[in-house]
Amino acid sequence: MSDSLIQIGAGAFAPRPGTRGGRPEWLRIKLSTPSSYHQVRHLVDRLKLHTVCQEARCPNIYECWGEHGTATFMILGDVCTRRCGFCAVTSGRPQAGVDPLEPEHVAEAVETMGLRHAVITSVDRDDLPDGGARHFAQVIEAIHRRIPSTAVEILTPDFRGVPDALDVVLAAAPEVFSHNMETVPRLYRQARPGSRYDRSLSLLAEAARRLRPAAETATTAEPVADHAEPTYQGRIKTGIMVGLGEQPEEVLATLADIRGAGVEILTIGQYLQPTPKHLPVARWVHPDEFAAFRAHALALGFAHCESGPLVRSSYHAHEHVRPKTD
């Protein structure tokens, strides 16, 4: 373990076996529901949209909806074809197809909320031939068409490794492409059945290979060869959770894998058990250890790292990307 990491047990503790355990002081938040919270909820309900804030029981919903007036929209329905052990989203076989009105409804919500940075995620849709890639592209295009100044961040599933799915979403020009690694390789079978560590890492690596920062793309003077792979502008991002039973050494190895894949932006947060049916919390990670993980990530070369007990994938997402100009 890196010398920069605090020793396990120094300020952290594990919940009692068989219980959800009492949360430590650093995870207790004050609940408030200002008017902006109700405005966001009314808008989401009116347009019949889903948000990961609600479906995944995000602890930051009151901060994002109430204080910042932001939300992460979840497209492609509210039923996921996979059953991850940490996720509160309903799993099963989706009964509905893709809503053709959803792209415009999401764009309307983004415009009404005045978002400068919109985050779009989805359930897994393994029942669709392209995993939902084309629908992602349509949502991105609808937002850009309606509000050109808004940056779009997408948090996608792995599309089951379907060929060309990545190009479909990247061709729609999202400002940020994100796919979460979630946890260390050893815990994938219990935490992410249906997903593979190597497949997720390969998706990030391929996206990083295709994506080029805007400045780099603009200054490239090399001629483009016939049949060359397309390259796009944008940034690449991922996130992991801790507290599922991983060891700090495994976290450091995973961070090295992620950075080696070319990822620039990283989030690290505490796993919170959504219901007693989900995986138990193995331990509560102390804020000092989160700070140490962040320091290690920056030393590896990540451009940005949000690391803390309540950090989630889209937490302060707008702060990681330079605002678009009108």
What are these regions (language model features)?
Residues 62-73, 86-100:
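Iron-sulfur (Fe-S) cluster-binding segments and ferredoxin-like electron-carrier domains
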Residues 88-106, 111-208, 237, 265-267:
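Core AdoMet radical
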